[in-house]
Amino acid sequence: MMQDLRLILIIVGAIAIIALLVHGFWTSRKERSSMFRDRPLKRMKSKRDDDSYDEDVEDDEGVGEVRVHRVNHAPANAQEHEAARPSPQHQYQPPYASAQPRQPVQQPPEAQVPPQHAPRPAQPVQQPAYQPQPEQPLQQPVSPQVAPAPQPVHSAPQPAQQAFQPAEPVAAPQPEPVAEPAPVMDKPKRKEAVIIMNVAAHHGSELNGELLLNSIQQAGFIFGDMNIYHRHLSPDGSGPALFSLANMVKPGTFDPEMKDFTTPGVTIFMQVPSYGDELQNFKLMLQSAQHIADEVGGVVLDDQRRMMTPQKLREYQDIIREVKDANA
């Protein structure tokens, strides 16, 4: 029984709550609907009031113009003033009534447009009035009168500078380079030359005298005049000397007994022109130098005691040809 009562109370309470909620929603919607219905009316009324106020302002502005036309009807003007003060219902009539006189009011400004064109031609009349006032150019000629005085002063030194400038190129001796071809003619005048080669020990060492003597003799050199060795046309020492070998250390002489002899190097030289073909003699001289260097463990150097190069060999050959052509 208790459980049935609880269920009944719960159901009744739920129904009551639902009824209250439905009643609340219904009343709220009713109030909202009434509010929305009243708002457009209020808006319309407010708009009408605003329109009536604007029309009153327009009537007040245009009443002056309307009064001009109704000057003879004095009582009608008094009624219009009294009608303008009451409720806005009477204010809707003046705009319609004043709408007719407004059209002629807009026309007079159109009639005033032509007089505006009339003053325009008067403007060009004023422009020439400003144009004939060139009083300022009268001041400009005053300044050039002062300017010409310094201008000739500056123009005077300019010709002086120009006078100095032509003097400088006159002093420049440009034709002197013509004398350069003269030394070129001196080269073919060389009628003799000395071709020099050196066979030297490596840096910090010296050539052994006994090894040096054996290599010199194998190359065909024979001890002779001026206490140096000579390479003759024939290996037995007969015939003219083709080139010679001297000591690199001054005075350049040798001692035939070279067992205890040491030297940093020897010099081989050939005088051009020489007997026979100088180019062939030069090749024989180069072969002798290379043979001696290989035997004693030295190197072949040029006349400046630098490592012999193919370029230096061609230079020696060119010198030999030059001397041969000069003596031809």
UniProtKB/Swiss-Prot annotation:
It comes from Escherichia coli (strain 55989 / EAEC). This is Cell division protein ZipA. Residues 51-63 have a biased composition (Acidic residues). Essential cell division protein that stabilizes the FtsZ protofilaments by cross-linking them and that serves as a cytoplasmic membrane anchor for the Z ring. Also required for the recruitment to the septal ring of downstream cell division proteins. The chain crosses the membrane at residues 7-27. The lineage of its organism: Bacteria, Pseudomonadati, Pseudomonadota, Gammaproteobacteria, Enterobacterales. It is found in: Cell inner membrane. InterPro entries: Cell_div_ZipA (IPR011919), ZipA_FtsZ-bd_C (IPR007449), ZipA_FtsZ-bd_C_sf (IPR036765). Keywords: Cell cycle, Cell division, Cell inner membrane, Cell membrane, Membrane, Transmembrane, Transmembrane helix. It holds the Pfam family ZipA_C. Residues 42-186 are annotated as: Disordered. Residues 99-115, 123-171 have a biased composition (Low complexity). Gene3D superfamilies: ZipA, C-terminal FtsZ-binding domain (3.30.1400.10). Disulfide bonds: none annotated. It is a single-pass type I membrane protein. The keyword Cell membrane applies. Residues 28-328 are cytoplasmic. Residues 1-6 are periplasmic. HAMAP family: ZipA (MF_00509). Belongs to the ZipA family. GO terms for cellular component: cell division site; plasma membrane. Interacts with FtsZ via their C-terminal domains. The gene is zipA.
